[in-house]
Structures are given as structure tokens and as C-alpha cells.
Amino acid sequence: MNSLFTSAFSPLAVSLGLLLVMTSAFPTPGPLGEDFKNDTTPSRLLLTTPEKTEALIKHIVDKISAIRKEICEKNDECENSKETLAENKLKLPKMEEKDGCFQSGFNQAICLIKTTAGLLEYQIYLDFLQNEFEGNQETVMELQSSIRTLIQILKEKIAGLITTPATHTDMLEKMQSSNEWVKNAKVIIILRSLENFLQFSLRAIRMK
């Protein structure tokens, strides 16, 4: 009798076991909780809202501030006016009136396109930052990862209206310098310009 009972129900037991395994592997999506709103890790922000995108930008700005602070703690002339000497050699993406990101003449679509294109152009400068920064590399890598995530989010918003710019590896060579002060000045300028660039983009990000 026991043998018959086992024979009859073993297929059902196997099926239930498989169902439990599949349920564990692929959990049913639930509503997003409050913890998600404060989670600025790139993998979570791909499913995003304007609020979460804004949180990601603020997360990036915090990382920029942390790197600048670390550099300034080691360099007494960290952010003085002499930086303009190094700035003349850098062609950093900047917001202009025609880009639609300023309060006057604001245009969300144009601003989003400019923001995405500009962040793509910043990639080569971030590579320079990673090569030259002698501090916490983990912070720099997290900054780059967060910016790549932001680019992906923005690309979805503008539906492929821009193409990835060509990589100019020779630019990295031109930015190199044996002078420690010039090197640090360039890093600071890149970080400060990137922060300003992101701040101007927030108006377009906040709109539904």
C-alpha cells in the first residue's frame, strides 16, 4: 500500500518542488518601497522616475565633492585663480543659451539632448581623471559607473536622437603633464565643470 501511495504522488511532489524552485528564482515583483527611493546604486536606478534620476545626479555631485575635497586636502593652492592657465587647454562641454537648459529659453527636449551628448564627451576626461587621480580609486570608479547609468537613463528619454561621439585617445596624451600642480589643476577643473554641467541639467530632469 505504501509503495502504491508513493508511486501515485511522487510526480506531484516533483512538480511542487520544481514550482517552489522557480518561485524562489523568479520572485513576483512587488511595489517599490521607501528604501528604493533612497537607493542611488546604478542597477536600481535603471527603472527610474524624475525623482530617482535627480537623486542619482545628487549622488554624482556628492562623489565629485568628495574627490575635490581629497585633492584639496593635499594641495594648498587647490582652487585658486591660476587654474585658468590649465583651463585654456581643456575643451570641456559647457551649457550655452542655445542648449535650452537655462531658465530663459528653457526647452526640455533640447536640454536633455545636450546633457546626454555632453556627458558622453566627458567620458574621455573622466578617463584622464582615473589615470591621474592618486587618491581613492573606488570613488572615481563609482563616479564613472554612476555617470554611465545616468547616460543610459537619458538615452531612453531622448529615444536615440544622438550618437556616441568618436573616442579621441590622443586627447589623453595631450592632457598629460609632468607638472604636479598643472595635473591637479586640470582634475579640479574637470570636476568643477562637470558639476556645473549637471546642475544646469536638473531643470529638464525634474519635469515629468
Curated annotation (Swiss-Prot):
Signal peptide positions on this chain: 1-29
GO cellular component: extracellular space; interleukin-6 receptor complex
Sites carrying sugar chains: N38
UniProt cross-references to SUPFAM superfamilies, sorted A to Z: 4-helical cytokines
Pfam families per the UniProt record, alphabetical: IL6
Keyword check for Nuclease: no
Record-level Gene Ontology MF annotations: cytokine activity; growth factor activity; interleukin-6 receptor binding
Bridged cysteine pairs (disulfide): C72-C78, C101-C111
Coiled coil segments of this chain: none
Function as written in the Swiss-Prot or TrEMBL entry: Cytokine with a wide variety of biological functions in immunity, tissue regeneration, and metabolism. Binds to IL6R, then the complex associates to the signaling subunit IL6ST/gp130 to trigger the intracellular IL6-signaling pathway. The interaction with the membrane-bound IL6R and IL6ST stimulates 'classic signaling', whereas the binding of IL6 and soluble IL6R to IL6ST stimulates 'trans-signaling'. Alternatively, 'cluster signaling' occurs when membrane-bound IL6:IL6R complexes on transmitter cells activate IL6ST receptors on neighboring receiver cells. IL6 is a potent inducer of the acute phase response. Rapid production of IL6 contributes to host defense during infection and tissue injury, but excessive IL6 synthesis is involved in disease pathology. In the innate immune response, is synthesized by myeloid cells, such as macrophages and dendritic cells, upon recognition of pathogens through toll-like receptors (TLRs) at the site of infection or tissue injury. In the adaptive immune response, is required for the differentiation of B cells into immunoglobulin-secreting cells.
UniProt record similarity statement: Belongs to the IL-6 superfamily.
Subunit structure: Component of a hexamer of two molecules each of IL6, IL6R and IL6ST; first binds to IL6R to associate with the signaling subunit IL6ST. Interacts with IL6R (via the N-terminal ectodomain); this interaction may be affected by IL6R-binding with SORL1, hence decreasing IL6 cis signaling. Interacts with SORL1 (via the N-terminal ectodomain); this interaction leads to IL6 internalization and lysosomal degradation. May form a trimeric complex with the soluble SORL1 ectodomain and soluble IL6R receptor; this interaction might stabilize circulating IL6, hence promoting IL6 trans signaling.
Protein's name in the database: Interleukin-6
Organism for this UniProt entry: Ovis aries (Sheep)
